[in-house]
């Protein structure tokens, strides 16, 4: 077990942003986290990343509990690879792609420590895994959004994380770029079956066959969680959206339609 949340809540300025959330993530599990804007996803991710405390409930992150002996927020973050659109914007256009990836070993924006030969080899290894070897010496600013996402995923893998959190990685990508990214992720999942993943999205079309579990977040609480087929179900999502929708599962992918 990597993550165990028991009835956690987070209150800000007198308002509960998330409440009564219980969620357990085991080694090797690939999860979808799905919720509309304002559902509390950002707050939940901040708690998982040890950037925000829970105000009630019991939280265990990689065997450690906040406030207990042995807990270290830095150690929690060392176990997590996190990729988000806000992270993408923090790197300068003039940085070399290889250096962006290497910075992941130091958990820094930019490199401020001595780079060793094995760091360079690691960066090349993960760039190759993401299909980005040819871009190693290029400027980060020359890359497309999809290419930058692959670079940031390679960067996240530099720390050998137990949990990879992908916060809307396909946001803003066209169809081809999205499918290229999802193909690269599928290959990653196959190569590292022990890696746990939380894939955050607004679109069921991004859910690939290796993501076998789903968590629906609505109004700050868990609406439903479990096996992906039971979560991405027409009746379940119709209730979730309070609109009549239909889910099509074909060729190991999902599509969502509004019934009219």
Which role fits each region the language model picked out?
Residues 57-68:
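Conserved ABC transporter NBD signature motif
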Residues 164-168:
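Catalytic Walker B motif of ABC-type/P-loop ATPase nucleotide-binding domains
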Residues 212-227:
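H-loop (His-switch) and adjacent beta-strand-loop-beta switch element
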Residues 49:
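Helix-to-loop junction immediately C-terminal to a conserved catalytic motif
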Residues 117-135:
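Conserved ABC ATPase "signature" region
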Residues 3, 18-20:
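Conserved structural motif at the start of ABC-family nucleotide-binding domains
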Residues 139-143:
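Conserved ABC ATPase signature
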């Amino acid at each position: 077990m990597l993550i165990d949340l028991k009835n956690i809540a987070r209150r800000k300025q007198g308002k509960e942003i998330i409440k009564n959330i219980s969620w357990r993530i085991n080694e090797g599990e690939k999860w979808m986290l799905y919720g509309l804007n304002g559902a509390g996803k950002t707050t939940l991710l901040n708690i998982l990343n040890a950037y925000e405390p829970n105000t009630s409930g019991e939280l265990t992150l990689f065997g450690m509990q906040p406030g207990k002996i042995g807990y270290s927020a830095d150690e929690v973050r060392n176990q997590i690879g996190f990729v988000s659109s806000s992270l993408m914007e923090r790197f300068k256009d003039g940085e070399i792609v290889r250096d962006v990836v290497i910075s992941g070993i130091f958990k820094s924006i930019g490199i401020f420590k001595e780079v060793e030969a094995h760091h360079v080899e690691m960066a090349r290894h993960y760039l190759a895994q993401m299909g980005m070897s040819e871009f190693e010496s290029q400027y980060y600013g020359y890359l497309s959004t999809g290419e930058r996402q692959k670079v940031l995923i390679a960067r996240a893998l530099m720390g050998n994380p137990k949990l990879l959190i992908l916060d809307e990685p396909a946001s803003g990508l066209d169809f081809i770029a999205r499918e290229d990214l999802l193909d690269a992720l599928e290959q990653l999942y196959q190569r590292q079956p022990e890696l746990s993943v939380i894939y955050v999205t607004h679109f069921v079309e991004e859910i690939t066959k290796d993501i076998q579990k789903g968590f629906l977040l609505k109004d700050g609480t868990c609406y439903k969680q479990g096996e992906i087929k039971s979560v991405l179900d027409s009746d379940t999502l119709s209730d979730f959206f309070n609109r009549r929708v239909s889910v099509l599962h074909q060729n190991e992918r999902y599509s969502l339609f509004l019934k009219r």
